[in-house]
């Protein structure tokens, strides 16, 4: 489920995964891969880092696990007055992160006709930290 709210003119954006009934081992494994990919990307977020590096961290992990072709979008985007803003965390993005940026980190794996998993959180960059 993709959730969001607008408070004081600013957007939020997050996604959570859920299932009804028994969850098979492949879905549990895919969820774990996506969660680890998100953590890998979050570990790269800091001022001065190119957005493509955070994307690469998530994408390489998913690819190593055999699902590279099933990761069909960028890793994240800026959020603010608009729901989708700059900077963009994608393979080709040369944008550089800076203090004050608010970005989503939302890797996903999508297996058509079966299931998909995406985990999305927002991160606020300060000079010294990333706040989730």
Which residues fall in each region the model found?
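Active-site neighborhoods and metal-handling regions in enzymes and metal-associated proteins
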Residues: 1-132
